[in-house]
């Protein structure tokens, strides 16, 4: 830990020609750790992410730069990306506020105001459109169904291979098989407008002004896409977002498709499996939980609809 902090200090001073006053770990995620770095000149505070996944940090930097020009909420300005031995470092603005995963957010003065603030930011991002679907930097598909079918085939093949090797549970395979069987029905109705999706717009990646009960910004975009609006809604159902009833608020404001509830569970599961592909590891208990939720949602909704 001390050696890594010293490395960060040395790199920041070399790259930005400033003096570092302190380095403190302030967060940890699936792909790396984040350090709060105090320096002697503007911007005075930096967030420096360290990771063994250099390619992922390249993608994150590019996504942050792209997103910052197109949304109303704050996105960290990036300063440099470099690699030292086997560790990559991405330096960016430190957005002041409270992480949405902090327990203190449960005691926020005005939950309704916070909910509306988050929803307004999401709706603003969803007002940014493209005439094609797919990766944010190269959308080439005419429909969302066309893009997601190609994406899902990779998820399916990966899951099947893991299942055949006894590396993934049968309930996960069952859920993925259900998606494959009913794919054309579920995706029969989608939006014809591609909107810009952060890809990981859930509470731990949201920065909150506690006393104003407002969203300040968002960090850590993941697999950013031009997608149908419902793609990102699973993020609203996770963690404290569920307590705020963000998904219910979205459905009050917007007309959703007949199978929206299924797609929320489907996207959540496929997102976790995509992380498994990228990182080579997963939390089996959580994947099982997401699979069971999807199976239940599909049985309920397909029976009613």
Residue ranges, per PLM feature:
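Conserved catalytic motifs of the protein kinase core domain
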Residues: 43, 87, 192-194, 214
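ATP-binding pocket architecture of kinase catalytic cores
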Residues: 23-141, 146-149
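Short beta-strand segments
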Residues: 47-51, 79, 196-199, 218-219, ...
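An alpha-helical support segment within catalytic cores of ATP-dependent transferases
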Residues: 3-16, 115, 127-199, 210, ...
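Alpha-helical scaffolds flanking conserved acidic
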Residues: 260-268
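Active-site Asp-x-Gly
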Residues: 194-196, 202-261
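ATP/Mg2+ or Mg2+-diphosphate-binding catalytic cores
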Residues: 252, 275-305
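A glycine-centered beta->alpha junction motif in the catalytic cores
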Residues: 84, 92-107, 156-160, 270-285
């Amino acid at each position: 830990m001390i050696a890594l902090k010293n490395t960060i200090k040395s790199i920041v001073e070399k790259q930005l020609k400033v003096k570092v006053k302190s380095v403190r770990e302030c967060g940890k995620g699936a792909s790396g750790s984040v350090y709060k770095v105090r320096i002697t000149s503007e911007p005075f505070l930096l967030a420096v992410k360290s990771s063994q996944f250099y390619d992922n940090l390249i993608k994150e930097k590019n996504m942050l730069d792209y997103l910052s020009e197109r949304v109303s909420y704050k996105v960290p300005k990036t300063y440099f990306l470099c690699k030292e031995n086997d560790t990559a470092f991405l330096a960016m603005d430190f957005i002041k506020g409270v992480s949405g995963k902090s327990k203190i957010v449960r005691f926020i003065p005005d939950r309704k105001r916070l909910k509306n603030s988050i929803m307004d930011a999401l709706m603003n991002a969803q007002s940014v459109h493209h005439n094609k679907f797919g990766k944010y930097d190269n959308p080439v598909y005419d429909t969302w169904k066309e893009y997601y079918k190609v994406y899902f085939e990779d998820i399916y093949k990966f899951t099947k291979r893991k299942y055949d090797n006894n590396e993934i549970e049968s309930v996960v395979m069952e859920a993925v098989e259900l998606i494959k069987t009913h794919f054309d029905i579920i995706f029969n109705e989608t939006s014809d407008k591609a909107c810009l999706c952060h890809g990981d717009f859930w509470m731990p990646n949201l920065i909150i002004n506690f006393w104003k009960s407002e969203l300040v910004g968002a960090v850590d975009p993941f697999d950013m896409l031009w997608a149908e609006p419902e793609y990102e809604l699973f993020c609203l159902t996770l963690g404290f977002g569920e307590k705020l009833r963000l998904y219910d608020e979205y459905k009050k404001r917007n007309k959703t498709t007949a199978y929206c509830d299924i797609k929320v569970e489907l996207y959540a599961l496929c997102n976790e499996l995509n992380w498994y592909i990228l990182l080579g590891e997963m939390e089996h208990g959580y994947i099982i939980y997401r699979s069971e939720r999807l199976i239940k949602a599909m049985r309920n909704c397909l029976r009613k609809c």
